[in-house]
Design a protein with these regions (language model features):
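Glycine-rich, proline-tolerant flexible connector loops at the mouths of alpha/beta enzymes
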Residues: 318-323
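Alpha-helix-loop-beta-strand connector modules within alpha/beta enzyme cores
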Residues: 337-340
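Short internal beta-strands
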Residues: 342-351
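Short Gly/Thr/Asp-enriched flexible loops that form oxyanion-binding sites at enzyme active sites
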Residues: 110, 324-335
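ATP-dependent carboxylate/acyl-activation modules
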Residues: 1-197, 202-316, 328, 350-362, ...
Length: 386
């Protein structure tokens, strides 16, 4: 689950990190009123959307008085902001954030995330922070330092020093940076975060280490433990279909292709998408039905897939382990009859009771194309939509 910058900064502040003073609002009138509380005559106006690249897209403005702030806020609020992370449709700006301008001396990059390969927490640091960090990673990867640390109650002083050594700070600012690393580690563990990113982390001309921007994501499977984090969720920033899928315990991510996928298991879902691409088409979604497939769940999955007007065919790929293929097949048949699917439907079943499942599909009277294996399924669904 993603949250907005202003929310992430409040969490950082709670853990003792330095962040610029700021205010947010959903309308310009409230924003101007709240901005008067800030002790500055120069402001940074920021669009609040769940996407990076706002600065290059015109979503960050520096203004020197309230009159200009009002003018820029009226332009930005309601604007469809298109960045390299939003896709061509962009994201509508529905909330704005204003903070005090910082006197920047140096810009750094700092992030903390789960490294699933090593099963450790990885801190990534660089002295090349700012809007061009992606280019730095691509063109000069030696400028980026990765430090992997074990899951513990606290991070060691030695690991903190490794992480910040690329910043080349003096003793005072170095001590602040170490305190920040400890704070980030603590909030990361305590809140089941997947990512904490500070870009840029800055050293001010007053020699203070300040989080100038902040991004956080949290493990959705752990949100039941953190109602205060759950309350920060902004459904306006999420795909309506993904919200609907979560109500039915379906893992769904919308993509840009033409073949809808319904699969059990994330690994099998990834393999299914790969083989669709191998046969020359693109998957329209990632959809994992998990370990159960009642008529209601399959019906919900079909409706979500078919709500995407780009879908020209559907591939169901099920390996029966915990899930019985005959139960899944009956759910598919019942749901297909109820919804009246008008695009080609290819089903591949393997595992527990797969023969019984195939018979249910064959005797359904529906135009369901049966496949023997994953390659056969991908080939048939690609041919069917031509």
């Amino acid at each position: 689950m993603n949250i907005h910058e202003h929310q992430a900064k409040q969490i950082l502040k709670k853990y003792g990190a330095n962040v610029p003073e700021g205010v947010f609002a959903f309308n310009v009138s409230d924003l101007l009123q709240k901005t008067k509380e800030l002790k500055t005559d120069k402001y940074v106006l920021k669009a609040q959307i769940h996407a990076g690249g706002r600065g290059k897209a015109g979503g960050v403005k520096i203004v020197d008085n309230l009159e200009n702030l009002e003018k820029e806020a009226n332009i930005l609020l309601g604007k469809n902001l298109i960045t390299h992370q939003t896709g061509p449709l962009g994201r509508e700006v529905k909330r704005l954030y204003v903070e005090e301008v910082s006197n920047i001396s140096k810009e750094f990059y700092l992030s903390c995330l789960v490294d699933r390969v090593s099963s450790k927490i990885a801190f990534i640091s660089s002295d090349q922070g700012g809007m061009n960090i992606e280019e730095v990673a691509q063109n000069t990867p030696e400028k980026i330092l990765t430090t992997k640390v074990d899951f513990n109650q606290e991070i060691s002083e030695a690991d903190c020093k490794k992480i910040i050594r690329v910043f080349e700070l003096d003793d005072n600012s170095g001590s602040e940076a170490i305190s920040l690393i400890k704070a980030i580690y603590k909030l990361f563990i305590e809140n089941d975060a997947n990512l904490v990113e500070i870009n840029p982390l800055i050293l001010t001309k007053e020699n203070k280490v300040v989080c100038l921007d902040a991004k956080m994501t949290f493990d959705e499977n752990a949100l039941f433990k953190h109602p205060e984090i759950q309350e920060l969720r902004d459904y306006n920033e999420e795909e309506a279909t993904e919200i609907e899928a979560s109500k039915h315990d379906l893992a769904y991510i919308k993509l840009d292709g033409s073949i809808g996928c319904m699969v059990n298991g994330a690994g099998l879902a990834m393999a299914t998408m790969d083989i669709i691409k191998l046969y020359g088409e693109e998957p329209a979604n990632f959809l994992d039905v998990g370990g159960g497939a009642s008529k209601e769940k399959v019906s919900a999955a079909f409706k979500i897939i078919l709500s995407d007007k780009n879908v020209k065919g559907i591939l169901i790929n099920i390996f029966g382990g915990i899930m019985r293929c005959d139960v899944l097949a009956q759910g598919v048949v019942d749901a297909a009859k109820e919804i009246k699917i008008e695009v080609p439907l290819v089903v591949r079943l393997a595992g527990t009771n797969f023969e019984e499942g195939k018979k249910i599909l064959e005797n359904s009277g529906l135009k369901i194309i049966s496949a023997n294996d994953l390659s056969d399924a991908a080939k048939k669904v690609v041919e069917a939509i031509k």
